[in-house]
A protein has these predicted regions:
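Non-catalytic, soluble scaffold/interaction modules
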Residues: 1-179
C-alpha cells in the first residue's frame, strides 16, 4: 500500500508539471485534461478499488492499478456518448503512468533524428505534451478520434494530426506528408 501511495504522489507531481507545460504550449483549456487526471487519481472510486485489491486480495500495486484502470476504462467504453467513450483512453493513460512509476520506469523520448512525422498505434495526452515540438512536424495514429484529448491538444498546439489512419510499420524512415 505504501508503494501505491508513493506512486500516487509522484503521479500527482508529474501531472502538475504536465499541466504547466500544456498550459504554456496549448492554453488553460487544453491543459485542463491533466486536472481531470488528478481528479480521477484522487477520486474515491479509482483509489478505493486499488486500495481494496491491495488490502483484501493481497495483490501487488501494479496489478491492482491495472485491474482498477481496466474496469473504469471499460465502464467509459460502454457509454453511448462518443465523448465519454474517448475518456477511456485517458483512464488507460493514467493507469499506465502509475504502473510505470511503480516499476521505476522513466519517461522515454524519441532519439535525436531531426524533424519527424510520428506514426503510432496511439498517443496519450501525456505523450503529446512531452514531445519536442521543435522536431515534430505532425503525427498519425491508428487509434483515437477527433474527440480525444490528444486531438484537442494537437489542435491547440498547432501540430498537424490525423487519427484513425492505419499505420504501416514499414514506413519508418520514409518521406511522408500529412494532408
Amino acid at each position: 500500500l505504501r508503494r501505491y501511495e508513493a506512486a500516487k504522489e509522484t503521479a500527482l507531481r508529474q501531472l502538475d508539471e504536465l499541466y504547466e507545460k500544456a498550459r504554456k504550449e496549448a492554453g488553460e483549456d487544453s491543459a485542463a485534461v491533466f486536472d481531470v487526471y488528478a481528479m480521477i487519481l484522487e477520486g474515491a472510486q479509482f483509489d478505493a478499488s486499488i486500495r481494496s485489491a491491495i488490502e483484501s486480495q493481497n495483490v501487488n500495486a501494479e496489478y491492482a492499478v491495472a485491474v482498477a484502470g481496466d474496469d473504469l476504462a471499460k465502464m467509459f467504453e460502454a457509454m453511448d456518448d462518443e465523448y465519454f467513450r474517448a475518456r477511456s483512453a485517458d483512464i488507460r493513460d493514467l493507469s499506465e503512468r502509475l504502473i510505470s512509476i511503480l516499476q521505476g520506469d522513466s519517461v522515454k523520448s524519441a532519439p535525436g533524428v531531426g524533424a519527424v512525422i510520428l506514426a503510432a498505434k496511439d498517443l496519450t495526452p501525456s505523450e503529446t505534451v512531452q514531445m519536442d515540438k521543435s522536431r515534430l512536424l505532425g503525427f498519425i495514429t491508428e487509434f483515437g478520434s477527433s474527440n480525444s484529448h490528444t486531438a484537442i491538444l494537437a489542435r491547440t498546439m498547432n501540430v498537424p494530426a490525423l487519427m484513425g489512419i492505419p499505420v504501416d510499420e514499414h514506413l519508418e524512415g520514409r518521406i511522408a506528408i500529412i494532408d
